[in-house]
Amino acid sequence: MELLDVDGAWLYTPEIMRDERGEFLEWFRGRTFQEKIGHPLSLAQANCSVSRKAFCAASTSPTPPPGQAKYVTCASGTVLDVVVDVRRGSPTFGRWAAVRLDAARHQGLYLAEGLGHAFMALTDDATVVYLCSQPYVAEAERAVDPLDPAIGIEWPTDIDIVPVGEGTPTHRPWRRPRRPGILPDYEGVPGALHRGGGRRGTGP
């Protein structure tokens, strides 16, 4: 597993065995995960999202503290998956990292509790599957506008992006929700174990 430029975000690249019958891989290994992260992934919910090309969704901490850790993979098509550090007090607060997840490499992306998550479908029928450490709580969701220039995510310029949730009460500009009580705090988050460095705005 490779530590990305956002603290608490890791990328796993599985070994894929291919022959005339097809292919086989392990897109998640509990032992490898625990050795790198320092604790097991608690599984409370598994989600599957199928999106048309150009649709983009983002959320920050969709459960009460400490938040919801996620382990994400793309089962079909291709997505640009983005991690944003929205945890107050984090050494990488405000930074983002983006990776292309697709059905060819079958990589897995881990996001620690409290990290913001956004993805954009680069193909039709892009299928994202993710394991969650806590159940989703709709009334606790806090979404940040993924297209806000204050964050500066470098989305593809050759696709007309269709943001999901734009204009809803929880879909805030980036600067507004920095006050206490809206964004999650870094201290006490179980996933805040590896304090990586990095640059603001790391692209794929």
UniProtKB/Swiss-Prot annotation:
GO biological process, one term: dTDP-rhamnose biosynthetic process
Site (Participates in a stacking interaction with the thymidine ring of dTDP-4-oxo-6-deoxyglucose): residue numbering on this chain: 136
Disordered: annotated segments: 164-204
Pfam family, one: dTDP_sugar_isom
Keywords recorded for this protein, A-Z: Antibiotic biosynthesis, Isomerase
Domain of life: Bacteria
Enzyme category, top tier: isomerase
Binding annotation for substrate: 21, 26, 45-47, 70, 117, 141
PANTHER family for this protein: DTDP-6-DEOXY-D-GLUCOSE-3,5 EPIMERASE, THYMIDINE DIPHOSPHO-4-KETO-RHAMNOSE 3,5-EPIMERASE
Family to which this protein belongs: Belongs to the dTDP-4-dehydrorhamnose 3,5-epimerase family.
Protein name, as recorded: Probable dTDP-4-oxo-2,6-dideoxy-D-glucose 3,5-epimerase
